[in-house]
Amino acid sequence: MKKTFESLLAVLFTLCGSASFGAEKAPVDYVNMFIGSCGPHVTEYGGTTPAVSDPFGMTQWCAATRLNKISATMYHHADDRLIGFMGTHQPAIWMGDYGYFTMMPQSGALRTDPEQRAVPLERDTECGTPYYYTVSHTEPDGSRIRTEFTATSRSSFFRFAYADSGAPMLMIEAGRMCEGGGIEIIPERNEIRLYNKERFDAHLGPRLYRFACYYVLRFSEPFADFGTWTDGTVSEGRRSDAAPNVGGYVRFASDVRTVEVRIGSSFIDYAQAADNLDREIGRERTFEQVKASGRDRWNRELSRVSIKGASEDDLTVFYTAFFRTLQYPREFSEYGRYYSPFDERIHEGTSYTAYSLWDTFRAQHPWLQLVQSERGDAMVRSLVQMYEESGWIPKWANPTFTNIMIGTHADAVIADAYVNGFRGYDLEAAYRAIRKDAFTPPTRDEHYRWGDRDFWNGGYEARAGLTHYMKAGYVASDRTDESVASTLEYALDDYCIAQMAKGLGHMEDYRALMERSRNYRNLYNPQTGFFQARRSSGEWDADDVGFTEGANWTYRFCVMQDVPGLIELMGGRDAFVKALDENFDKGHYRHDNEPGHHYVYLYAHCDRLDKIQTRLPGILAANYRNSPDGLSGNDDLGQMSAWYIFSVMGFYPLTPASGEYALGIPAFEEFELALSNGNRLKIVARDRKKHQTMEVVRFNGKRLDRPFIPVREIMQGGVLEFSTK
């Protein structure tokens, strides 16, 4: 039996990442699921996992090597153990999971505690793709178990192969924290139903009384034995239980060697979970059929971009980055209905969640406009629905308010979509939502300092310190935390809202907001050449006060909306270029976090395309590699990856809602994009390897006279050509 088991493994790994021997690799075959899954620091790395789902899938499925929490994902490539397999909704390393559960195939004695059930992770048996994952392990009794799973958006299909086992079983953990969950075992139907009410971020947002994720598990084999457990105490034969730390188990006949489990998930109820499972996997489709369909779906999306002149490593890094941008925001609706975590009702319509807006407004959302335009209106509409259901658009929906980060960057996402032609939502409702961000301070604004990740105080933070910002033109450091960063980002959001106001004819708002978009000037200290905190009295505060995830160098160039004005403040083009050079040459630039992601493209406003082109290769090489530690910072729901994609293609969305891209330089000789609006864009840089700079840029044969190109021209398709003459 063991020899047969290992032979099956050999076949399995042959087929894991490719269609067949001798076949040309497809884009999906280049994806390395483990890039960014570890790093030199416990939290400062990619924070990615080899989770399996459909593009933008509602529920992801992932091997667990540790207990996840805020600041730790469930999988880390440096770990040497396996504690289970999870249905998870944790979107990022610094955000919490919710509505999750864990399974662990076992043999012999039941082990419920994560430390007791941990087994060595056999890395040489592990294989992960966007649509499939497998790994094998050895149980304490010496028997071997292979786990495989594939997934759709709301469902999954697991296959457990038990070799040399006289007591095959599956352990299930439905809850492990205060909110807990419940489990019901239905042996007559070979079925388990469970729910989980936990939200790791619950202390950062409002209480949800009706929240739960429901799961329906259908087994291919009957249960020979079953029971539940709470806090490690086992109740043999018990069919149901509910508690903070709760789970169950099922045993199979001693001669069972393969068990298949089909799982549906839902935030509505068990009936919807079963319906999702029926729609996406059903009862008749085989594991191989579901896996093949998942591969086809991912490959169809990834095939929207083709590349010439790139190495195997380059293609791997690119398509892995592309894959990461197709995970978020994630679907939250279920075939025409969705549970709202804002008013706790069931609504009709389409919904998305997991909007890491402080990060993703910069490049992730602009990238999706090009390659997922069919989802663009629905993603904006989801934000508007949140406003209609709660009175505000959250800064970080996970899945409800969390008061994480600063700024109200849904303003930038919505206005940018509007400027770039996305109009399939209630325009005036969208404008009312972002206008409220600009003109309505949070409740008891001046009573709280609004520290990052403060416990929920009963109100949404929105723009903390907006009261003083509207009076004096800046957020006061003696009243509100993160005052410098907030002032700079409110000014950007004001600019973005102003562009939508202008388009909709709200000219009084437009003029007021454009004036406010220059509020960054109020914190610029000409004596130091840096932005600096001010107290409510107008006096300068200490130069290390008021920043978010950085210091004064991190925010020195954090003005996207009025770069000419910033250049003037800093003494003109020559002085500005010199300051940018110092930023890069003296080690001040940090690509591992978002505030500086646009900095290299600021050279475009000084007509120094050559500076952009000579610096980009070094930034790319230092921060993106084909290895588990290949991301220098948290991917943040696709932002790090989207920056890479734009930057290797030769243009970047420097200023949201401006309607234009700044130019860079393609990293490879040719790209071809099948834009999701049906147009095609070709990017050409012939003999790229021979030239460090290619400053002559033409679009459809016409030479560009400045290092920018309109977004709408790119969307219309054509040929963008870089050359030396």
Task: Locate each region found by the language model.
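Accessory carbohydrate-recognition regions in carbohydrate-active enzymes
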Residues: 23-412, 418-488, 496-522, 528-531, ...
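Bacterial Sec-dependent N-terminal signal peptides
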Residues: 1-24
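ATP-dependent phospho-/nucleotidyl transfer catalytic cores
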Residues: 493
